[in-house]
From Swiss-Prot:
GO terms for cellular component: plasma membrane; proton-transporting ATP synthase complex. F-type ATPases have 2 components, CF(1) - the catalytic core - and CF(0) - the membrane proton channel. CF(1) has five subunits: alpha(3), beta(3), gamma(1), delta(1), epsilon(1). CF(0) has three main subunits: a, b and c. GO terms for molecular function: ATP binding; proton-transporting ATP synthase activity, rotational mechanism. Belongs to the ATPase epsilon chain family. It comes from Desulfotalea psychrophila (strain LSv54 / DSM 12343). InterPro entries: ATP_F1_dsu/esu_C_sf (IPR036794), ATP_synth_F1_dsu/esu (IPR001469), ATP_synth_F1_dsu/esu_N (IPR020546), ATP_synth_F1_esu_C (IPR020547), ATPsynth_dsu/esu_N (IPR036771). It is found in: Cell inner membrane. Disulfide bonds: none annotated. It comes from the Bacteria. Keywords: ATP synthesis, Cell inner membrane, Cell membrane, CF(1), Hydrogen ion transport, Ion transport, Membrane, Transport. Produces ATP from ADP in the presence of a proton gradient across the membrane. This is ATP synthase epsilon chain. Pfam families: ATP-synt_DE (PF00401), ATP-synt_DE_N (PF02823).
Length: 138
């Protein structure tokens, strides 16, 4: 059996995952990256996206929100705002959030003081699209 790296995903609610895995692929703010056993130490910010990990032939996917990642001593730890396993994502809710966000973005002639609201709508749309992508296994 190949060497493994310990993966831990922590949210404000507590530890979501703590297991040995073969490989981790993460959505870093500077681009996606992969980590295997014995990886060099690394710190990275994490953006909203799909975090995947493999154990043997089994591939698992989580939707993670923003946070941080540390690789050290054959362990990779993610501290993220939220994490949802593929099977836990409510696709109906995600689709409704996508539609709401698209409607907010589609409004024209927003006053300048609503620019913040528009940015929030874009972030909500991005989260909904990632949830749907993870739920559909893409």
């Amino acid at each position: 059996m190949a060497q493994q790296i310990n993966l831990e995903v922590v949210t404000p609610s507590g530890s979501i995952i703590n297991k040995d895995v073969d490989i981790v692929n993460a959505p870093g703010s500077g681009g996606d990256f992969g980590v295997l056993a014995n990886h060099a130490p690394l710190l990275s910010t994490i953006k909203i996206g799909a975090l995947t990990y493999e154990i043997g032939e089994e591939r698992n996917t989580l939707m993670v929100s923003g946070g941080f990642c540390e690789v050290s001593n054959n362990k990779i730890t993610f501290l993220v705002e939220s994490a949802e396993a593929k099977q836990d994502i409510d696709t109906d809710r995600a689709m409704k959030a996508k539609i709401r966000a698209e409607k907010r973005i589609a409004k024209h002639g927003l006053p300048s003081d609503e620019a913040y609201s528009d940015t929030r709508a874009e972030a909500a749309l991005h989260r909904a699209l990632i949830r749907l992508r993870v739920a559909q296994g893409l």
